[in-house]
Structures are given as C-alpha cells and as structure tokens.
Regions:
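Short capping/connector residues at structural and topological boundaries
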Residues: 30, 38, 45-48, 103, ...
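Short acidic, glycine/serine/threonine-rich loops at helix termini
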Residues: 21-23, 29-32, 61-63, 97-102, ...
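Conserved short S/T/G-enriched processing/targeting/catalytic segments and their helical context
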Residues: 1-92, 119-120, 129-134
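C-terminal binding/interaction regions
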Residues: 2-9, 87, 91, 95, ...
Length: 163
C-alpha cells in the first residue's frame, strides 16, 4: 500500500528561509488518508527547518538520519547534507534538496519546490518573488495555496516554518 502526495516549497528572501508544506497524505491514487500531516518541522534546537515529500517511511527515515548528521556535524547544514547524501546513495544561509538517490541540490534562485504540486508551487513562488515585496514565509504559503488549488494530491492545511 503506497502512500504519496505532498508539496513542499522553500523560499529564501531578505536573509530568511521559509518552508511551507501541505498536510495531505494520499493512499494509492485516489484516497485521501490524512489531511493534517506535519511534513515541515524544526530540528537541531529549532535552528534548522526541514520539509519532506515522498514515501512516508522513507521521509521519516531520511529526516531522522539528517538530524543525526546535523548533530554530528555541529549544525553545519552543508556538511550534514553532503555526508548524508554520500551515505544514502541514499544554517540559515543554505537551502538544499537531498534526493532519495543522494543528489544534493542548491537552487540558484533561492526557491525550490518538491512533490506532486512542486511545479505549480515553484512557478507561483518565482512569480511572487519577482513581482511582490512579500516575505519568504508569505511567498511560500501563497505558492502552496496555488499548488493546492490545482494538484489533487496537495491540500490547503499548510504549515510554514521560518529561520
């Protein structure tokens, strides 16, 4: 029984990084299993914000491993991500995507979005970044709302965390 469906959007603006995630967990292709899952959370003494999409078990496993690495690397986000990626094949200044296959991606424009509604959220966030003075948190939330209005695997129970 595969569980899927989520959208995570991260935005970096004016020295702040905000990550927003919806709360929907979908089982199979057509059943909403949960509406209020928490896929964005703070770790490392609330100094780092993470968001995850994909298989529930894989996502929790990846988050736990990442938090362990972050502690081992004394809070160095980049070292922890690279260390985890090398092992996995599986800070406030860095926003990184770590994929299940071990790639570590640092987006060029300070915006990234993943999951089933990721492309919608990414497009919305880029438009908002370019055409408004909204904060990182406001952009991330509004981008998620756009994705939720289009993608059936994304809902509008949105949690936003900012560092």
């Amino acid at each position: 029984m595969a569980m899927m469906g989520t959208t995570i959007c991260a935005v970096k603006r004016d020295g702040k990084i905000a990550i927003a995630g919806d709360g929907q967990v979908t089982m199979g292709e057509n059943t909403i299993f949960k509406n209020s899952a928490r896929k964005v959370r703070r770790i490392y003494n609330d100094k780092v914000v993470t968001g995850f999409a994909g298989s529930v078990a894989d996502a929790f496993s990846l988050c736990e491993r990442f938090e362990e690495r972050l502690n081992q690397c004394n809070g160095s986000l980049e070292r922890a991500a690279v260390s985890l990626a090398q092992d996995w094949r599986a800070d406030k200044e860095n926003m990184l995507i770590v994929s299940g296959t071990g790639e570590v991606i640092d987006p060029d424009d300070g915006i990234c979005a993943i999951g089933s509604g990721g492309n919608y959220a990414l497009a919305a966030a880029r438009a908002l970044m370019e055409n408004t003075d909204l904060s990182a948190a406001e952009i991330a939330e509004k981008a998620l709302r756009v994705a939720a209005s289009i993608c059936v695997f994304t809902n509008d129970h949105i949690i936003v965390e900012e560092v």
